């Protein structure tokens, strides 16, 4: 069975964590977008929500379905340089950080 992928060719950089942002990114990926999830080395905190299997919760697996991922330390110059390069090449940038 084939289905339409209206967002095919759209590149998304996803720095969101938790529930809403990763879910949005998963929907974009399901509609064909190339979503790159950027996480800290310890992973998104949603990895511990609910029942876990290895390093992932069921929500973490579902919320990151169809995404590629990279772990970066945004407190380092190198980590910021890499994420800035990804953002420069992206069509969409998602984040869910608190203000400030």
Task: Please place each PLM-identified region on the residue numbering.
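N-terminal helix-loop segment corresponding to the beta1-alpha1 unit
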Residues: 1-100
């Amino acid at each position: 069975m084939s289905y339409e992928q209206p967002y095919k060719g759209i590149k998304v950089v996803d720095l969101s964590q938790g529930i809403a942002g990763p879910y949005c990114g998963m929907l974009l990926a399901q509609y064909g977008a190339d979503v790159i999830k950027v996480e800290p080395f310890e992973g998104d905190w949603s990895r511990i929500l609910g029942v876990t299997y290895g390093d992932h919760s069921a929500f973490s697996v579902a919320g990151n379905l169809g995404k590629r991922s990279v772990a970066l330390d945004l407190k380092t110059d190198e980590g910021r340089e890499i994420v800035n390069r990804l953002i420069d090449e992206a069509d969409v940038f998602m984040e869910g950080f608190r203000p400030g």
